Amino acid sequence: ERIGCSAGIPIIEELKARLESTGADAFELGIPFSDPSADGPVICISSKRALAGGSNTRKCMDVARQFRRHHPDVPLSLMIYINLAYAPGLDNFFEECREAGIDAVLIPDIPSTMRAAESEWDSAARNHDVQLISLVPPNAADEKIREISGHSEGYIYLMSRNGVTGTDRAACMPPSHIVNVMRVAGAPPALLGFGISKPEHVADAMRHGVAGVVVGSAYVRIINENLDDDEALHRKLSEFTQNMKAAAKGALLAE
């Protein structure tokens, strides 16, 4: 299971320690942005809080560095909007990602026309040994899925539904056909995201052939509801993670 959280909220140091101890398999660090077009209300509020607390890209990169020093082997992705990634120049951006210990970068609002095997984005990422993650929408045509699969690295973010992130709308399971097309095309593992908030979502996703799930808004909601109770925050984060992981393992054992 991969969990995500907006970096830079005022209690980031304490929160980072809590998240790191939940037992998640990988982490996704989201850089707050003033116009998070792919995110729903929960993460939008988190981003606004982070920005109000003085968060910026440089500080978020420092959070990544700290995480990497303490966890040299845990996969770490960065979720960032295209304007923030483009501002320092692509080469500079991906160079800093590599220096900060970031394994992969997800840019949710990058146009598909700007992604190809030899695009400037893919080349810059590859030059600095950073995986640039591709997204596949649930209504993608087979030809598009094969095209994306052919130049993707790390993992593919398979969207459970169109729209924005969040738990207000439940996840929809991907047609097994999409996963099969990706597999035949030699795609990296598919992780399902958007609306994943319950153990049954995880179990259903695994039965449909994905390799794992991405959970963001559900974690942010737990954090928002327990900011003033550190003990409850730690307990609920850990319990939630363990329940989600148990669902994944149960689905795999049932195969």
Language-model segments: what does each one mean?
Residues E1-A7, M79-Y86, V136-A140, L191-P199:
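Glycine-rich beta-to-alpha transition loops that act as phosphate-gripper elements at the mouths
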Residues F27-L29, L76-I80, V105-I107, L132-V136, ...:
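Hydrophobic faces of well-ordered beta-strands that scaffold small-molecule active sites
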Residues G23-D25, C97-A104, A125-L132, G150-Y157, ...:
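Glycine-enriched alpha-helix->loop->beta-strand junction motifs that scaffold or abut catalytic
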Residues A24-P36, A104-M114, Y157-T167, H208-D228:
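Glycine-rich phosphate-binding active-site loops on the catalytic face of alpha/beta enzymes
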Residues S34-I45, A52-F67, L84-N92, D109-N127, ...:
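Active-site-adjacent beta->alpha loops and helix N-cap segments on the catalytic face
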Residues A7-E20, A140-H151, A185-G186, L192, ...:
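Catalytic cores of alpha/beta
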Residues G8-I9, L15, D25-F27, I31-F33, ...:
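Active-site beta->alpha loop and helix N-cap motifs at the rims of alpha/beta catalytic domains
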Residues R183-P188, S197-E255:
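Alpha/beta catalytic cores of nucleotide-metabolism and tRNA/nucleoside-modifying enzymes
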